[in-house]
Amino acid sequence: MAKGDKFYYDNFAECASLAKKAAAYLVECLENYDLSKIEKMLEEMHTFEHSADMKKHEMNEALAKAFVTPVDREDLDLMSQQLDTVLDLIEEVLQKMYIYNIKTIEPAAIDYAKRLVKACDILGDIIAEFENFKKSKKLHALIVASNDVEEECDKLYLTTMHELTKNSTDVLTTLSWYKIYDCFEACSDACEHVSECVGSIVMKNT
């Protein structure tokens, strides 16, 4: 591998690591939820998102200067954006809880957050294999596993939204959780989009 190529894969690996940390921190926040401490939680969560933004800027600068890239620069740019979106959306879950002044956490939210940890763990494995995608014997199975987790999240979303509507007693609370669960679903979709991007790159370059 050319020395310059390693930058791209390392950058993606660092972003995937940040996503794993952010997802794990979200679970920690929800399992130990305290509305009086949510501003501090948001500050901590933002450090992960900000670090991911910096990695995206580094990628943009490198792509702008590069004469040759290991795969199409448009694909590298798209993947960088999609990884950043994962971090943005994980942070947004907590932001919405602050916006809607959520006082207690629904069990389904913790369940969803734990599935996001699983999705981000698989994403980290995919990115680790991506560096050697032409020889990897694991990458296809990992992409399938990522899709499986997204399907689990889809099922959880449908069940949770049904129960939320069926048991609704307060419009504001129902609307608040509706928006939060939408954000959880967007998170799981974003993880799958990264894995699909990797799959597309592999298909075009092997």
What do the PLM-derived regions correspond to, one by one?
Residues 1-206:
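Cytosolic, long alpha-helical scaffolding segments
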